[in-house]
């Protein structure tokens, strides 16, 4: 499949559906409340994530594809928070804000990696007049290559038939990840993507491949679909179309850690590929590869074009290890599109010692990815003297690449990495030692971009100079 590509130059996707904000409160639990037999959680940090149709849009944005998201939110703080979260990922939000309903919000309280409680803030949208939403759809859909209707049963898609008709009238394919057992309401859609359980709940138990094909083709005929893609967990996925041979794709997942959000990834990649003018076969192939990547991650995750391209061509992921500046810029862009926090530091790292290890581990804990910029041999010589470095650049970077705390390594030739930091613009710049933040090379560039700068302490008594002096004493 070497001709397949994860670069979607022509694609533009519109997503309409039940948008949600997922909130997580994390804290320690050390005692029981005197008021009731319940644990007391001392909240120490919180996190916000896009949920429902908003997560579908995040998946598309992670592929560097323009995406607009439509849905219903409340005129409230959570609606504003969700919009801000999405806009940071360059998702075009085109919501209808209601006075009468809250933004759908799910608040989870966790302690010691266990969920203690979930609080849902929502009201059914089935009684809402969706004429404004339909008008937005009719105005915008012609500008997109595909429409995803994301149904979580909250009522945003109560007029789903009208939505399908609007899109089909504009010759825009409609893809739906269905909810419930009433597939009749999706009549006329281009493609449905039920999982095996959802499929069997509608057509009945399937004991053989032949039954899946027979019942799937009947469903296509009954509700006038163009195609049906049944996702089958460890058995891969099967594409069915009238008068064409079934197209079966075996799973490509090496290890399955978490299937959360895999359905969102499948429909996102499918729609993106179709919007880019790819065939059903190629689109399903890419979606299957993406699903294999995302189930190997913990929690709701997205897939980047770097990961997808490498998986297509069976290359090891370039998202880790030693990189050129150009490769690093691409990897950072992909990571930021996934909402990851980028931390960057720099140094000579001539003879790696416990102080370095501790410092890098602490730096890595401050974000999702750690970049280490390493002085070239000439740069070290200018800074440290003619006798340095002890280890050349290739060896220094090879040792650093073996550390679990380090994601990306990049060399620089100047005396300071100021230019490089200005090109990469990490979310957080860290440096070890007695520096003041404003003295750190690249701090002005990071601050100007809205990032932060932090000084970390080195372990006392650990330094490359001390190691070298001890070696000299042994030699003497």
From Swiss-Prot:
Origin species: Haemophilus influenzae (strain ATCC 51907 / DSM 11121 / KW20 / Rd)
Name of the protein: Bifunctional protein HldE
GO CC, alphabetical: cytosol
Region annotation Ribokinase: where it falls in the sequence: 1-318
Family label: In the N-terminal section; belongs to the carbohydrate kinase PfkB family.
Biological role stated in the UniProt entry: Catalyzes the ADP transfer from ATP to D-glycero-beta-D-manno-heptose 1-phosphate, yielding ADP-D-glycero-beta-D-manno-heptose.
A Gene Ontology BP annotation from the UniProt entry: ADP-L-glycero-beta-D-manno-heptose biosynthetic process
GO molecular function, one term: heptose-1-phosphate adenylyltransferase activity
Quaternary structure (record): Homodimer.
């Amino acid at each position: 499949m070497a001709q397949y590509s994860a670069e979607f130059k022509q694609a533009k996707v519109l997503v309409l559906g039940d948008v949600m904000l997922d909130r997580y409160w994390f804290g320690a639990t050390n005692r029981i409340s005197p008021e009731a037999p319940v644990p007391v959680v001392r909240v120490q940090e919180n996190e916000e994530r896009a949920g429902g149709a908003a997560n579908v849009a995040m998946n598309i944005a992670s592929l560097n594809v323009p995406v607009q998201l439509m849905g219903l939110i409340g005129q409230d703080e959570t609606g504003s928070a969700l919009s801000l979260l999405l806009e940071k990922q360059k998702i075009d939000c085109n919501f209808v804000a209601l006075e009468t309903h809250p933004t759908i919000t799910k608040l989870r309280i966790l302690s010691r990696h266990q969920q203690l409680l979930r609080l849902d803030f929502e009201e059914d949208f089935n009684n809402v007049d969706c004429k404004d939403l339909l008008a937005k759809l009719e105005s915008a859909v012609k500008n997109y290559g595909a429409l995803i209707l994301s149904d979580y049963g909250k009522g945003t898609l109560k007029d789903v038939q009208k939505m399908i008709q609007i899109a089909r009238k504009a010759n825009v394919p409609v893809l739906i990840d269905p909810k419930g057992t009433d597939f009749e309401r999706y009549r006329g859609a281009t493609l449905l993507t039920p999982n095996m359980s959802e499929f069997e709940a509608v057509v009945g138990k399937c004991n053989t491949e032949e039954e899946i094909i027979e019942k799937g083709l009947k469903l296509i005929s009954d509700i006038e679909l163009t195609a049906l893609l049944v996702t089958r967990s460890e058995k891969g996925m099967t594409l069915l179309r009238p008068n064409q041979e079934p197209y079966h794709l075996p799973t490509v997942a090496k290890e399955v850690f978490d299937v959360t959000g895999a359905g969102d990834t499948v429909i996102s990649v499918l729609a993106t590929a179709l919007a880019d003018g790819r065939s059903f076969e190629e689109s399903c192939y890419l979606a299957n590869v993406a699903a294999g990547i995302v189930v190997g991650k913990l929690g709701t995750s997205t897939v980047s074009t770097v990961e997808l391209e490498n998986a297509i061509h069976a290359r090891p992921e370039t998202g880790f290890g030693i990189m050129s500046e150009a490769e690093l810029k691409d990897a950072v862009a992909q990571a930021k599109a996934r909402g990851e926090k980028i931390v960057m530091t720099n140094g000579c790292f001539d003879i790696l010692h416990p102080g370095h290890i501790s410092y890098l581990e602490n730096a890595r804990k401050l974000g999702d990815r750690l970049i280490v910029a390493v002085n070239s041999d000439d740069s070290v010589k200018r800074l440290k003297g003619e006798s340095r470095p002890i280890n050349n650049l290739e060896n220094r970077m090879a040792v650093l690449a073996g550390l679990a705390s380090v994601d990306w390594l990049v060399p620089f030739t100047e005396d300071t990495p100021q230019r490089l930091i200005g090109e990469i613009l990490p979310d957080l710049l860290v440096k070890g030692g007695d520096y003041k933040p404003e003295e750190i090379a690249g701090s002005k560039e990071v601050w100007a971009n809205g990032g932060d700068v932090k000084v970390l302490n080195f372990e006392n008594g650990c330094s490359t100079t001390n190691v070298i002096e001890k070696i000299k004493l042994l030699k003497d």
